[in-house]
Amino acid sequence: MKLNISYPINGTQKCIEIDDEHRVRVFYDKRIGQEVDGESVGDEFKGYVFKIAGGNDKQGFPMKQGVLLPTRVKLLLAKGHSCYRPRRNGERKRKSVRGAIVGPDLAVLALIITKKGEQEIEGITNDTVPKRLGPKRANNIRKFFGLTKEDDVRDYVIRREVTKGDKSYTKAPKIQRLVTPQRLQRKRQQKSLKIKNAQAQREAAAEYAQLLAKRLSERKAEKAEVRKRRASSLKA
């Protein structure tokens, strides 16, 4: 079985193949989300704690969280479900998925290091893979740098260097949800426009109601006149 071990703190991951079945037997009958002591896998993982994140069986079918079986099942999957990506709006499909309980039929098991042990694992804990892009949303930039609402977020945007031919220049993402004076002015303008439109609609509705009442009274008067004429002709 292969163990795909990831360390989110450093942004690294590595696939380690373990031929001895006795070493991976500790994972059997465990579910996705459960934690396992690393020392039972091998002495090189002493002090480590692994969390089971998923895996694939020998035919390539992925494990699905919530399916409490150690076998493969066919489920009707739709948009929002894991292990399925719909191609059309509202499309559903019955697909084979592997249950969330670990068994000997798995080819790859995905693990996350939740607690670091004594020794370094080559290529995982001793390396770091920096993030290529920084945060883009204004609140996330504030959270990333520990800024207050008074600080200007635009000074803290992470720029990246781009080289095109002989020239090199820096590039920064457009900050999303940034509150600027122009945005506040636009918001005020939209609000005043909304109030003006609502007032115009109210006035138009009142004018229409007045006209309708006038037409109804005119029709009523006409009918009364017709009745009066009819009554006078019958008397004559």
UniProtKB/Swiss-Prot annotation:
Record-listed Phosphoserine modification sites: S232, S233
One of the GO BP terms on file: translation
Post-translational modification (record): Phosphorylated.
Keyword terms: Phosphoprotein, Ribonucleoprotein, Ribosomal protein
Gene Ontology terms, MF aspect: structural constituent of ribosome
GO CC terms: ribonucleoprotein complex; ribosome
Family that this chain belongs to: Belongs to the eukaryotic ribosomal protein eS6 family.
Protein name: Small ribosomal subunit protein eS6
Organism of origin: Kluyveromyces lactis (strain ATCC 8585 / CBS 2359 / DSM 70799 / NBRC 1267 / NRRL Y-1140 / WM37) (Yeast)
Organism taxonomic ancestry: Eukaryota, Fungi, Dikarya, Ascomycota, Saccharomycotina
